[in-house]
Amino acid sequence: RRQRQMCIRDSMERDIEHRCMALLLRQQPVAGDLRRISTAMKVVTDIERIGDHASDIAEIIPHLVTVRKEGDPAVSQAIAMGRKAYQMIQDAMAALTAEDELAARKVIAADDAVDFDFNAIKHTLAQEIAADPAKVDAALDLLMVIKYLERIGDHAVNVAEWVQFVRTGRYKDESMF
């Protein structure tokens, strides 16, 4: 099932890239239109990677729920972190659709909270392992999940940065056109 989903995502990514290339070749867009097409080609990769990370998390969860107990503080923190990362994706996609630079800046700023959560949970897990080395597998599973969540947040930031590019022609404060 996971392999099939990955194939579908990869196929959709290639289709979007193909359509963008066809637009570039046939229409020879300039200025804003060129930035929009370039952004679509870049953003599709981030969206595909978000899907890959979500798939990786889904693969870990069935085992994780057997080794971590309900009410586990690290799991509760990870769930809160996941909600923040999810909101970043939602906000980044809304900013992209509306070409809203202010909304994009808010997504970029929100990444600090996800990064903070990642480091806090990682520290908690390190303490857990130090206190009881037998818990290393359960801690590593959760560590993988939070790393994927952190990367999802980073991909949402990338999408937001491309929104800024559409609006300004600048990517990460560097003029591209």
Q: What spans do the regions from the language model cover?
A:
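Divalent-cation-assisted or electrostatically stabilized phosphate/pyrophosphate-binding catalytic cores
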Residues: Q28-S38, K69-Y86, T97, E101-D112, ...
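Hydrophobic alpha-helical transmembrane segments that form the multi-pass transporter/flippase core
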Residues: R9, I16, V114, I121-L125
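A structural feature that tracks compact, well-ordered secondary-structure segments
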Residues: M41-V65, A92-L96, A104-I108, D115-K122, ...
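Short, small-residue-biased leader/transition segments that mark boundaries at the very start
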Residues: Q3-I8
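Conserved alpha-helical segments that form or flank metal/cofactor-binding pockets of metalloenzymes
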Residues: M12-C20, G51-A54
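Hydrophobic/aromatic-rich structural module bridging two neighboring secondary-structure elements via a short loop
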Residues: H18-D46
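Secondary-structure edge/capping motif, primarily at the C-terminal ends of alpha-helices
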Residues: R1, C20-Q27, I61-R68, I89-E99, ...
